């Protein structure tokens, strides 16, 4: 009976230790939804005997002679030049000081006995002080550079373009994901069909990965459980 209990205890211990390697990573994607968009089909062209066919889509059949090639329809592509360089610092300090002092005296011999024992007095003095000093500081910086070609998935009523895109790079046993979304003003698009990420409104840039390297950087769920319970 004791051998069975010891055997069960050993198996339970090994099971608990093995669970420390399991990691559940709760993460919410910063860029949600589809990361690509298909062009919208236009009306079926009808032959009218003219050289100019107005029913043809602008970018997929008819291209004006003096019109640029900037994206303006759903499904058009645009290259985002990632130029993110953000730094922030914060410091604070506080000082407080308070001092107090009290002094008073009283007779130790009753008045009717002062002629016999003399006038004896006692002095009592009390003082106190309180001092507080506090300082704090924080620094943060991040740099992100590169290029990513995105797709127009929505044309807003004011002409701005909502773009979204994703790039996947497989390296050995892991995969890196770069996702981007934001609102682009067509006036900021250069002649080479590029726009810097610093001129994109509501930009969402996400750089994540999966694989054993990413898993090794995360704490197991059981370790996190004991970490939350630890008073230290």
From Swiss-Prot:
GO terms for cellular component: bacterial-type flagellum basal body, distal rod, L ring; cell outer membrane. It is a lipid-anchor. Residues 1-21 form the signal peptide. It is found in: Cell outer membrane; Bacterial flagellum basal body. One of its GO terms (molecular function) is cytoskeletal motor activity. The keyword Lipoprotein applies. One of its GO terms (biological process) is bacterial-type flagellum-dependent cell motility. It comes from the Bacteria. A lipid is attached at residue 22 (N-palmitoyl cysteine). Disulfide bonds: none annotated. A lipid is attached at residue 22 (S-diacylglycerol cysteine). PROSITE patterns: PROKAR_LIPOPROTEIN. Belongs to the FlgH family. The basal body constitutes a major portion of the flagellar organelle and consists of four rings (L,P,S, and M) mounted on a central rod. This is Flagellar L-ring protein. It comes from Shigella dysenteriae serotype 1 (strain Sd197).
């Amino acid at each position: 009976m004791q051998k069975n209990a010891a055997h069960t205890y050993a198996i339970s211990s090994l099971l608990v230790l093995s669970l420390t390697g399991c990691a559940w990573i709760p993460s919410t994607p910063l860029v949600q939804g589809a990361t690509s968009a298909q062009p919208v089909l236009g009306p079926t062209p009808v032959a009218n005997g003219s050289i100019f066919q107005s029913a043809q889509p602008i970018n997929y059949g008819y291209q004006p002679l003096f019109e640029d090639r900037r994206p303006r329809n759903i499904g058009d592509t645009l290259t985002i030049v990632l130029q993110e360089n953000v730094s922030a610092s914060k410091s604070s300090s506080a000082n407080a000081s308070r001092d107090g002092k009290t002094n008073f005296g009283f007779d130790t011999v009753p008045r009717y006995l002062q002629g016999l024992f003399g006038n004896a007095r006692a002095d009592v003095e009390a003082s106190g002080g309180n001092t507080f000093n506090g300082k704090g500081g924080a620094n943060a910086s991040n740099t992100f550079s590169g290029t990513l070609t995105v797709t127009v998935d929505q044309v807003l009523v004011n002409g701005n373009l909502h773009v979204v895109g994703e790039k996947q790079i497989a390296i050995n046993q892991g995969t890196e994901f770069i996702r981007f979304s934001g609102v682009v003003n067509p006036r900021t698009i250069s002649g080479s069909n590029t726009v810097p990420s610093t001129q994109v409104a509501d930009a969402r840039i996400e750089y994540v990965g999966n694989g054993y390297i990413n898993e090794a950087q995360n704490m197991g769920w059981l370790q996190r459980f004991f970490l939350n319970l630890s008073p230290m």
